[in-house]
Amino acid sequence: MKKLAVVLLSGVSLMLSAQEAYSQGKVEVTWENTDKYTDVRPSNESRKRFKERTFKQLDEYLVELAEALPEGQTLNMTVTNLDLAGQVWPASFVGIGNGANDVRLIKSIDIPRIAFSFELLGADGTVLQQGEQNLKDMSFQDRHNPFFSSENLRYEKNMLRMWFEEQFEQNLAKS
């Protein structure tokens, strides 16, 4: 009996680690198979802590965007891939030191990308919109970005903001 309980608990733990969900009022975000994402590499912190912080910051920003939805509407998103702008390199490779530190170097060729499915639900639970998105912003360094240059994930947030405003334009006009 003890073995069965341990096996069941291990299975539940494995399922939870493969799929992280965040729910806050008008939006629910599920980060699916995060170990297979293209690029969520930290520069100078543990991989686990960096992923948690990155997902939390994007979750909080999506909550902020969803506040503009009409009362009763809920956005459900399942993120299947994330590729942050730039690449992580040893600091010595980019000419800013010779220590063991890493840095994320942002160049125009390393564009931000995010893949997800979404559903926008009405107050009665009916599906108002749904779809699959593979967002990428090839002009991320050239376009207007309302975020401060010191803000984390500013390119990814700007890409999500532009998608949100375009995708839900009709819904936002009604609120």
Regions picked out by a protein language model, each given a short descriptive name:
Residues 1-8:
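Bacterial N-terminal signal peptides that target proteins for export
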Residues 13, 17-18:
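N-terminal signal peptide c-region/cleavage motif recognized by signal peptidases
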Residues 22-26, 31-84:
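N-terminal segment of the mature soluble domain
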Residues 44, 130-162:
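Short secondary-structure boundary motifs at beta->alpha junctions and helix caps
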Residues 45-57, 105, 109, 150-154, ...:
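Soluble non-cytosolic domains of exported or imported proteins
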Residues 79-122:
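Surface-exposed short loop/turn segments
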Residues 125-127:
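Residue-level signal for glycine
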Residues 164-175:
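Short, low-complexity, Pro/Ser/Thr/Gly-rich segments in the mature regions of secreted, periplasmic
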